[in-house]
Amino acid sequence: MRTAVAAFLLAVLSAVALGQSQSVVWEGVMEAARKAYEQGRYEEAEKQLKSALQGAEGFEPRDPRLATTLEQIITVYRTQGKMALAEPHYHRLLGIQEGTWGPLDLRLVPTLNGLGMVYASARQYEEAESAYQRALTIREKALGDAHPDVATSLENLAGLYGSAAKFEQAALFYGRALDIREKSQGPEHLNVATTLESMAGLYRDQGKYALAEPLYRRALAIREKAWGPEHSDLVPTLDSLAWVCYGQRKFPEAEPLYWRSLVIWEKAVGADHPTVATALDNLAGVYVAEELFDKAEPLYRRALSIREKSALVSFDKLASLYAGEKKYPEAEQLYKQALAIAEKMNEPVELGMVLQKYAELLRLLERGEEAARLEARVKDIHAKLAAERPPEKKKPKH
Protein backbone atom coordinates (compact mmCIF):
# COMPACT_ATOMS: atom_id res chain seq x y z
CA MET A 1 0.00 0.00 0.00
CA ARG A 2 2.91 2.34 0.80
CA THR A 3 4.19 1.79 -2.73
CA ALA A 4 0.80 2.82 -4.17
CA VAL A 5 0.75 5.96 -1.99
CA ALA A 6 4.27 6.88 -2.99
CA ALA A 7 3.47 6.33 -6.66
CA PHE A 8 0.42 8.57 -6.51
CA LEU A 9 2.22 11.29 -4.55
CA LEU A 10 5.05 11.22 -7.07
CA ALA A 11 2.51 11.54 -9.87
CA VAL A 12 0.81 14.45 -8.08
CA LEU A 13 4.08 16.27 -7.49
CA SER A 14 5.01 15.80 -11.13
CA ALA A 15 1.59 17.05 -12.19
CA VAL A 16 1.85 20.10 -9.96
CA ALA A 17 5.19 20.89 -11.53
CA LEU A 18 3.47 20.72 -14.89
CA GLY A 19 0.55 22.82 -13.73
CA GLN A 20 -1.93 19.89 -13.69
CA SER A 21 -4.55 19.21 -11.01
CA GLN A 22 -4.91 16.18 -8.74
CA SER A 23 -8.09 15.40 -10.65
CA VAL A 24 -6.17 15.10 -13.91
CA VAL A 25 -3.69 12.74 -12.26
CA TRP A 26 -6.54 10.54 -10.97
CA GLU A 27 -8.08 10.40 -14.45
CA GLY A 28 -4.73 9.41 -15.95
CA VAL A 29 -4.19 6.61 -13.43
CA MET A 30 -7.75 5.34 -13.94
CA GLU A 31 -7.23 5.33 -17.71
CA ALA A 32 -4.01 3.35 -17.30
CA ALA A 33 -5.89 0.87 -15.10
CA ARG A 34 -8.68 0.57 -17.67
CA LYS A 35 -6.25 -0.21 -20.47
CA ALA A 36 -4.39 -2.76 -18.36
CA TYR A 37 -7.67 -4.47 -17.45
CA GLU A 38 -8.87 -4.62 -21.06
CA GLN A 39 -5.53 -6.18 -22.06
CA GLY A 40 -5.83 -8.82 -19.36
CA ARG A 41 -2.97 -7.38 -17.28
CA TYR A 42 -4.93 -7.64 -14.06
CA GLU A 43 -2.04 -7.26 -11.63
CA GLU A 44 -1.02 -4.02 -13.32
CA ALA A 45 -4.65 -2.82 -13.27
CA GLU A 46 -4.83 -3.67 -9.57
CA LYS A 47 -1.63 -1.71 -8.91
CA GLN A 48 -2.91 1.34 -10.78
CA LEU A 49 -6.28 1.23 -9.02
CA LYS A 50 -4.66 1.05 -5.60
CA SER A 51 -2.78 4.20 -6.55
CA ALA A 52 -5.99 5.82 -7.83
CA LEU A 53 -7.79 4.87 -4.62
CA GLN A 54 -5.16 6.60 -2.53
CA GLY A 55 -5.54 9.67 -4.71
CA ALA A 56 -9.33 9.60 -4.44
CA GLU A 57 -9.02 9.73 -0.64
CA GLY A 58 -8.00 13.36 -1.11
CA PHE A 59 -11.33 14.30 -2.67
CA GLU A 60 -14.46 15.26 -0.73
CA PRO A 61 -15.95 12.35 1.33
CA ARG A 62 -18.95 12.00 -1.01
CA ASP A 63 -17.07 12.69 -4.22
CA PRO A 64 -18.38 10.17 -6.80
CA ARG A 65 -14.83 9.45 -7.96
CA LEU A 66 -14.10 7.57 -4.75
CA ALA A 67 -17.07 5.27 -5.36
CA THR A 68 -16.05 4.86 -9.01
CA THR A 69 -12.55 3.80 -7.96
CA LEU A 70 -13.93 1.30 -5.46
CA GLU A 71 -16.24 -0.16 -8.12
CA GLN A 72 -13.34 -0.63 -10.51
CA ILE A 73 -11.01 -2.26 -8.00
CA ILE A 74 -13.85 -4.60 -6.99
CA THR A 75 -14.26 -5.59 -10.64
CA VAL A 76 -10.55 -6.38 -10.95
CA TYR A 77 -10.57 -8.48 -7.77
CA ARG A 78 -13.67 -10.39 -8.87
CA THR A 79 -12.21 -11.09 -12.29
CA GLN A 80 -9.21 -12.68 -10.59
CA GLY A 81 -11.40 -14.56 -8.11
CA LYS A 82 -9.97 -12.56 -5.20
CA MET A 83 -13.29 -12.38 -3.39
CA ALA A 84 -11.82 -11.91 0.08
CA LEU A 85 -9.97 -8.80 -1.10
CA ALA A 86 -13.13 -7.43 -2.70
CA GLU A 87 -15.21 -7.72 0.48
CA PRO A 88 -13.92 -4.69 2.45
CA HIS A 89 -14.23 -2.52 -0.66
CA TYR A 90 -17.86 -3.63 -1.06
CA HIS A 91 -18.57 -2.59 2.53
CA ARG A 92 -16.95 0.79 2.03
CA LEU A 93 -18.74 1.34 -1.28
CA LEU A 94 -22.06 0.43 0.31
CA GLY A 95 -21.46 2.91 3.12
CA ILE A 96 -20.74 5.70 0.64
CA GLN A 97 -23.81 4.85 -1.43
CA GLU A 98 -26.09 4.69 1.62
CA GLY A 99 -24.84 8.07 2.78
CA THR A 100 -25.49 9.55 -0.65
CA TRP A 101 -28.76 7.88 -1.64
CA GLY A 102 -30.30 6.59 1.57
CA PRO A 103 -30.82 2.99 2.78
CA LEU A 104 -33.70 2.04 0.45
CA ASP A 105 -32.46 3.29 -2.92
CA LEU A 106 -32.62 0.83 -5.82
CA ARG A 107 -29.09 1.77 -6.79
CA LEU A 108 -27.84 -0.09 -3.71
CA VAL A 109 -28.98 -3.44 -5.10
CA PRO A 110 -25.96 -4.25 -7.33
CA THR A 111 -23.59 -3.63 -4.42
CA LEU A 112 -25.71 -5.73 -2.04
CA ASN A 113 -25.87 -8.55 -4.59
CA GLY A 114 -22.12 -8.38 -5.12
CA LEU A 115 -21.54 -8.53 -1.38
CA GLY A 116 -23.92 -11.48 -1.15
CA MET A 117 -22.00 -13.29 -3.87
CA VAL A 118 -18.70 -12.70 -2.02
CA TYR A 119 -20.15 -14.17 1.16
CA ALA A 120 -21.71 -17.10 -0.71
CA SER A 121 -18.39 -17.95 -2.36
CA ALA A 122 -16.85 -18.12 1.13
CA ARG A 123 -19.79 -20.26 2.36
CA GLN A 124 -20.78 -17.53 4.80
CA TYR A 125 -24.41 -18.27 4.12
CA GLU A 126 -26.00 -16.21 6.89
CA GLU A 127 -24.14 -13.07 5.82
CA ALA A 128 -24.98 -13.75 2.17
CA GLU A 129 -28.64 -14.26 3.03
CA SER A 130 -28.72 -10.94 4.86
CA ALA A 131 -27.31 -9.07 1.84
CA TYR A 132 -29.60 -10.82 -0.67
CA GLN A 133 -32.64 -10.39 1.58
CA ARG A 134 -32.00 -6.68 1.90
CA ALA A 135 -31.73 -6.37 -1.89
CA LEU A 136 -35.05 -8.23 -2.19
CA THR A 137 -36.75 -5.93 0.32
CA ILE A 138 -35.54 -2.82 -1.50
CA ARG A 139 -36.82 -4.14 -4.82
CA GLU A 140 -40.19 -5.17 -3.41
CA LYS A 141 -40.75 -1.73 -1.88
CA ALA A 142 -39.60 0.15 -4.96
CA LEU A 143 -41.02 -2.05 -7.72
CA GLY A 144 -43.84 -4.08 -6.18
CA ASP A 145 -44.08 -7.80 -5.50
CA ALA A 146 -44.63 -8.83 -9.13
CA HIS A 147 -41.67 -7.20 -10.91
CA PRO A 148 -39.17 -9.40 -12.84
CA ASP A 149 -36.29 -7.89 -10.84
CA VAL A 150 -37.94 -9.19 -7.68
CA ALA A 151 -37.86 -12.64 -9.28
CA THR A 152 -34.12 -12.23 -9.80
CA SER A 153 -33.62 -11.49 -6.10
CA LEU A 154 -35.76 -14.50 -5.19
CA GLU A 155 -33.59 -16.66 -7.44
CA ASN A 156 -30.43 -15.37 -5.77
CA LEU A 157 -31.81 -16.44 -2.41
CA ALA A 158 -33.05 -19.75 -3.80
CA GLY A 159 -29.60 -20.55 -5.18
CA LEU A 160 -28.06 -19.67 -1.83
CA TYR A 161 -30.51 -21.91 0.04
CA GLY A 162 -29.72 -24.74 -2.35
CA SER A 163 -25.99 -24.35 -1.68
CA ALA A 164 -26.71 -24.40 2.05
CA ALA A 165 -28.80 -27.59 1.64
CA LYS A 166 -31.99 -25.75 2.64
CA PHE A 167 -33.85 -27.41 -0.18
CA GLU A 168 -37.42 -26.68 0.90
CA GLN A 169 -36.75 -22.96 1.16
CA ALA A 170 -34.92 -23.02 -2.17
CA ALA A 171 -37.87 -24.72 -3.90
CA LEU A 172 -40.29 -22.23 -2.35
CA PHE A 173 -38.33 -19.21 -3.57
CA TYR A 174 -37.84 -20.69 -7.06
CA GLY A 175 -41.59 -21.30 -7.18
CA ARG A 176 -42.29 -17.66 -6.29
CA ALA A 177 -39.81 -16.46 -8.90
CA LEU A 178 -41.35 -18.70 -11.56
CA ASP A 179 -44.85 -17.43 -10.80
CA ILE A 180 -43.68 -13.81 -11.12
CA ARG A 181 -41.88 -14.44 -14.41
CA GLU A 182 -44.80 -16.30 -15.97
CA LYS A 183 -47.23 -13.52 -15.07
CA SER A 184 -44.99 -10.55 -15.87
CA GLN A 185 -43.02 -11.85 -18.87
CA GLY A 186 -45.23 -14.59 -20.27
CA PRO A 187 -44.97 -18.40 -20.03
CA GLU A 188 -42.65 -18.71 -23.04
CA HIS A 189 -40.09 -16.07 -22.10
CA LEU A 190 -36.48 -17.23 -22.02
CA ASN A 191 -36.17 -16.02 -18.42
CA VAL A 192 -38.91 -18.50 -17.54
CA ALA A 193 -36.78 -21.25 -19.07
CA THR A 194 -33.82 -20.18 -16.94
CA THR A 195 -35.90 -20.31 -13.76
CA LEU A 196 -37.31 -23.70 -14.74
CA GLU A 197 -33.79 -25.05 -15.24
CA SER A 198 -32.64 -23.67 -11.90
CA MET A 199 -35.52 -25.37 -10.13
CA ALA A 200 -34.92 -28.57 -12.07
CA GLY A 201 -31.24 -28.48 -11.09
CA LEU A 202 -32.26 -28.23 -7.44
CA TYR A 203 -34.33 -31.40 -7.76
CA ARG A 204 -31.67 -33.16 -9.84
CA ASP A 205 -29.01 -32.50 -7.21
CA GLN A 206 -31.26 -34.16 -4.63
CA GLY A 207 -31.77 -37.17 -6.89
CA LYS A 208 -35.42 -36.22 -7.44
CA TYR A 209 -35.23 -36.91 -11.16
CA ALA A 210 -38.97 -37.40 -11.68
CA LEU A 211 -39.61 -33.85 -10.42
CA ALA A 212 -36.77 -32.39 -12.48
CA GLU A 213 -37.73 -34.03 -15.79
CA PRO A 214 -40.92 -32.06 -16.67
CA LEU A 215 -39.20 -28.79 -15.77
CA TYR A 216 -36.30 -29.53 -18.10
CA ARG A 217 -38.72 -30.59 -20.85
CA ARG A 218 -40.63 -27.34 -20.58
CA ALA A 219 -37.41 -25.29 -20.54
CA LEU A 220 -36.23 -27.14 -23.64
CA ALA A 221 -39.49 -26.44 -25.47
CA ILE A 222 -39.21 -22.72 -24.70
CA ARG A 223 -35.61 -22.54 -25.91
CA GLU A 224 -36.35 -24.55 -29.06
CA LYS A 225 -39.16 -22.19 -29.98
CA ALA A 226 -36.91 -19.17 -29.44
CA TRP A 227 -33.71 -20.47 -31.08
CA GLY A 228 -34.67 -23.39 -33.30
CA PRO A 229 -33.82 -27.09 -32.83
CA GLU A 230 -30.10 -26.96 -33.68
CA HIS A 231 -28.80 -24.06 -31.59
CA SER A 232 -25.69 -24.91 -29.57
CA ASP A 233 -27.12 -23.24 -26.45
CA LEU A 234 -29.70 -26.04 -26.31
CA VAL A 235 -27.02 -28.57 -25.40
CA PRO A 236 -26.88 -27.93 -21.62
CA THR A 237 -30.65 -28.42 -21.40
CA LEU A 238 -30.55 -31.52 -23.61
CA ASP A 239 -27.77 -33.02 -21.52
CA SER A 240 -29.50 -32.22 -18.23
CA LEU A 241 -32.75 -33.75 -19.45
CA ALA A 242 -30.88 -36.81 -20.72
CA TRP A 243 -29.16 -37.14 -17.35
CA VAL A 244 -32.40 -37.17 -15.34
CA CYS A 245 -33.87 -39.69 -17.80
CA TYR A 246 -30.75 -41.81 -17.36
CA GLY A 247 -31.10 -41.50 -13.58
CA GLN A 248 -34.61 -42.98 -13.88
CA ARG A 249 -33.28 -45.75 -16.16
CA LYS A 250 -35.27 -44.31 -19.06
CA PHE A 251 -32.46 -45.18 -21.43
CA PRO A 252 -34.53 -45.10 -24.65
CA GLU A 253 -35.44 -41.49 -23.81
CA ALA A 254 -31.91 -40.46 -22.82
CA GLU A 255 -30.32 -41.87 -25.99
CA PRO A 256 -31.92 -39.52 -28.59
CA LEU A 257 -31.25 -36.51 -26.37
CA TYR A 258 -27.54 -37.30 -26.20
CA TRP A 259 -27.57 -37.98 -29.96
CA ARG A 260 -29.00 -34.50 -30.54
CA SER A 261 -26.27 -32.96 -28.41
CA LEU A 262 -23.64 -34.84 -30.39
CA VAL A 263 -25.01 -33.73 -33.76
CA ILE A 264 -25.33 -30.12 -32.62
CA TRP A 265 -21.74 -30.02 -31.35
CA GLU A 266 -20.38 -31.64 -34.52
CA LYS A 267 -22.01 -28.93 -36.62
CA ALA A 268 -21.06 -26.12 -34.25
CA VAL A 269 -17.40 -26.89 -33.47
CA GLY A 270 -16.35 -29.64 -35.88
CA ALA A 271 -16.11 -33.41 -35.59
CA ASP A 272 -12.66 -33.43 -33.92
CA HIS A 273 -13.31 -30.90 -31.15
CA PRO A 274 -12.76 -32.09 -27.54
CA THR A 275 -16.36 -31.12 -26.71
CA VAL A 276 -17.51 -33.73 -29.21
CA ALA A 277 -15.51 -36.33 -27.27
CA THR A 278 -17.53 -35.52 -24.15
CA ALA A 279 -20.79 -35.88 -26.11
CA LEU A 280 -19.60 -39.26 -27.41
CA ASP A 281 -18.81 -40.39 -23.87
CA ASN A 282 -22.29 -39.41 -22.69
CA LEU A 283 -23.98 -41.36 -25.45
CA ALA A 284 -21.72 -44.36 -24.99
CA GLY A 285 -22.57 -44.37 -21.28
CA VAL A 286 -26.23 -44.96 -22.13
CA TYR A 287 -25.33 -47.93 -24.32
CA VAL A 288 -23.17 -49.38 -21.55
CA ALA A 289 -26.07 -49.08 -19.12
CA GLU A 290 -28.20 -51.00 -21.63
CA GLU A 291 -25.36 -53.53 -22.08
CA LEU A 292 -25.16 -52.62 -25.77
CA PHE A 293 -21.39 -52.82 -25.71
CA ASP A 294 -21.01 -53.17 -29.47
CA LYS A 295 -22.59 -49.71 -29.84
CA ALA A 296 -20.63 -48.14 -26.99
CA GLU A 297 -17.18 -49.29 -28.09
CA PRO A 298 -16.85 -47.32 -31.37
CA LEU A 299 -18.08 -44.19 -29.61
CA TYR A 300 -15.49 -44.52 -26.86
CA ARG A 301 -12.80 -45.25 -29.46
CA ARG A 302 -13.73 -42.14 -31.42
CA ALA A 303 -13.70 -40.06 -28.23
CA LEU A 304 -10.25 -41.41 -27.41
CA SER A 305 -8.99 -40.58 -30.89
CA ILE A 306 -10.24 -37.00 -30.58
CA ARG A 307 -8.54 -36.55 -27.22
CA GLU A 308 -5.31 -38.04 -28.53
CA LYS A 309 -5.29 -35.58 -31.43
CA SER A 310 -5.94 -32.72 -29.05
CA ALA A 311 -3.16 -33.88 -26.75
CA LEU A 312 -0.84 -34.24 -29.75
CA VAL A 313 -1.37 -30.61 -30.72
CA SER A 314 -0.71 -29.49 -27.13
CA PHE A 315 2.47 -31.58 -26.88
CA ASP A 316 3.71 -30.16 -30.18
CA LYS A 317 3.04 -26.54 -29.23
CA LEU A 318 4.67 -26.86 -25.82
CA ALA A 319 7.66 -28.71 -27.26
CA SER A 320 8.12 -25.97 -29.86
CA LEU A 321 7.98 -23.39 -27.07
CA TYR A 322 10.64 -25.21 -25.06
CA ALA A 323 12.83 -25.57 -28.13
CA GLY A 324 12.55 -21.84 -28.79
CA GLU A 325 13.61 -21.19 -25.19
CA LYS A 326 16.52 -23.64 -25.62
CA LYS A 327 15.03 -25.96 -23.00
CA TYR A 328 16.04 -28.91 -25.13
CA PRO A 329 15.66 -31.78 -22.61
CA GLU A 330 12.09 -30.70 -21.85
CA ALA A 331 11.31 -30.32 -25.57
CA GLU A 332 12.70 -33.76 -26.38
CA GLN A 333 10.66 -35.42 -23.64
CA LEU A 334 7.49 -33.89 -25.05
CA TYR A 335 8.34 -34.95 -28.60
CA LYS A 336 8.84 -38.51 -27.33
CA GLN A 337 5.41 -38.42 -25.73
CA ALA A 338 3.89 -36.93 -28.87
CA LEU A 339 5.56 -39.61 -30.97
CA ALA A 340 4.12 -42.37 -28.78
CA ILE A 341 0.62 -40.92 -29.25
CA ALA A 342 1.07 -40.48 -33.01
CA GLU A 343 2.30 -44.08 -33.41
CA LYS A 344 -0.78 -45.32 -31.58
CA MET A 345 -3.18 -43.18 -33.61
CA ASN A 346 -2.15 -44.73 -36.93
CA GLU A 347 -2.55 -41.35 -38.63
CA PRO A 348 0.35 -40.96 -41.09
CA VAL A 349 0.05 -37.19 -41.53
CA GLU A 350 0.24 -36.52 -37.79
CA LEU A 351 3.02 -39.08 -37.39
CA GLY A 352 5.05 -37.46 -40.15
CA MET A 353 4.63 -34.03 -38.57
CA VAL A 354 5.90 -35.20 -35.18
CA LEU A 355 8.83 -37.10 -36.70
CA GLN A 356 9.88 -34.03 -38.70
CA LYS A 357 9.72 -31.71 -35.68
CA TYR A 358 11.63 -34.19 -33.52
CA ALA A 359 14.27 -34.57 -36.23
CA GLU A 360 14.72 -30.78 -36.38
CA LEU A 361 15.33 -30.73 -32.64
CA LEU A 362 17.87 -33.53 -32.92
CA ARG A 363 19.69 -31.56 -35.63
CA LEU A 364 19.92 -28.63 -33.23
CA LEU A 365 21.42 -30.97 -30.66
CA GLU A 366 23.95 -32.23 -33.26
CA ARG A 367 22.58 -35.76 -33.10
CA GLY A 368 22.62 -36.21 -36.84
CA GLU A 369 22.36 -40.01 -37.02
CA GLU A 370 19.19 -40.09 -34.92
CA ALA A 371 17.73 -37.22 -36.93
CA ALA A 372 18.51 -38.99 -40.20
CA ARG A 373 16.62 -42.09 -39.10
CA LEU A 374 13.53 -40.03 -38.31
CA GLU A 375 13.82 -38.11 -41.58
CA ALA A 376 13.98 -41.40 -43.47
CA ARG A 377 10.72 -42.43 -41.85
CA VAL A 378 9.17 -39.11 -42.89
CA LYS A 379 10.21 -39.75 -46.51
CA ASP A 380 8.68 -43.23 -46.40
CA ILE A 381 5.41 -41.81 -45.08
CA HIS A 382 5.29 -39.15 -47.80
CA ALA A 383 6.03 -41.77 -50.46
CA LYS A 384 3.22 -44.03 -49.25
CA LEU A 385 0.78 -41.13 -49.12
CA ALA A 386 1.75 -40.12 -52.66
CA ALA A 387 1.26 -43.69 -53.90
CA GLU A 388 -2.19 -43.87 -52.34
CA ARG A 389 -3.24 -40.55 -53.83
CA PRO A 390 -5.39 -41.00 -56.97
CA PRO A 391 -3.74 -39.72 -60.17
CA GLU A 392 -4.82 -36.29 -61.32
CA LYS A 393 -7.03 -36.25 -64.38
CA LYS A 394 -5.44 -34.59 -67.35
CA LYS A 395 -7.28 -31.57 -68.61
CA PRO A 396 -8.55 -31.99 -72.19
CA LYS A 397 -6.74 -29.95 -74.80
CA HIS A 398 -8.80 -27.42 -76.72
Give the predicted meaning of each segment.
Residues A6-V16:
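Bacterial N-terminal signal peptides
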Residues A17-K47:
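N-terminal leader/linker segments that initiate helical-solenoid repeat arrays
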Residues E27-E38, P64-T79, L106-S121, P148-S163, ...:
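Conserved alpha-helical positions within TPR/SEL1-like repeat arrays
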Residues G58-P61, G99-P103, T137, K141-D145, ...:
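Short coil/turn linkers that connect adjacent helices within long alpha-helical scaffolds
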